[in-house]
Amino acid sequence: MNTVKDSKPLALELVEVRKQYGDHTALDGVSLNVPKASIFGLLGPNGAGKTTLIRMVAGITGPDSGSISFFGKSLTSEHINEVGYLPEERGLYKNMRVGEQAMYFARLRGMSKTVARKELLDWFERLEVDGWWNREVSDLSKGMAQKIQFIVAVIHKPKFLILDEPLSGFDPINAARIRKEIIRLRDEHGTTILLSTHDMSSVDELCDHVALINHGRKILDGPVNLLREKARAGKIDLTFRGNLISFTAALGSGAILHSADSKGDNVHEVVLGLPATIPIEKFLKWVTTEVDVLSCSPQSVSMDDVFLRAVKDSTANKIEQS
């Protein structure tokens, strides 16, 4: 599948990247373009190859073939301090104090002691964990520990940030707080964010672009709004009062009736497919001669819908090819 090109400069470019572990192909010719200062969703079922791709970008492993460019240069270990990484498998040293451990990680990233302490205290206050600086890590709740690890991932102001399931385990209030910070990092600091998640509501809210990987291959790629529009494919939701048979007869040969649900009192909710050659205004003129249209709007398509359809189609194609 071709990579979607974007007019914005690229933060990350993968070209035909492959990775094999024994007989298992983790990535099979994956190409991606991640625009600068964007939130790019990396999606896929468990075992699809997302973690392998993330580990490559984080510098933990390398591809067997293909290339990875980081802000226009070949990705090397020299770029490690320009990347922030929040792994799905969290881990803090339980026998250290919270502030001591945060300082340790900040210093590893090359920050001076003075700057690290100032930046950390600002973040601790922002995420409302400032009262925990001198507490033991073992005293932290799961949510508190996740906040600390988020801070550690972003403290050195990386220009590229990898977030693997960053909202997992948060209550709704703190999940909203972290989402707000992710958006702020993009908008105020120009941070490019690679977001790996199964939470499609977060994808809807946060992501500018997404790529979907399944069985080690990219099966979907593009701006979120365009993928939703493509998945909608001219479908509209319509509610009317009248005779369903008369309504169906009034559709003509162009429109397609996908589903119909009778609600009682002669009211029906239907999903229709209209080709681009039939404007919705023209269509409504046809049907209003037969029924009373109560509401009509383009069908709402979420990224959850897009994800499920793409994975289903990909799996069906794989079965056909096997």
PLM segments and residue spans:
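Primarily ABC-family ATPase nucleotide-binding module
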Residues: 2-10
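ABC transporter nucleotide-binding domains
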Residues: 9-12, 19-214, 220
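Short, surface-exposed acidic/glycine-rich loop or hinge patches that mediate macromolecular interfaces
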Residues: 73, 218, 241, 274-277, ...
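Short, flexible helix/strand-to-coil boundary loops that buttress conserved ligand/catalytic motifs
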Residues: 79, 231, 311
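ABC transporter nucleotide-binding domain
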Residues: 180-274
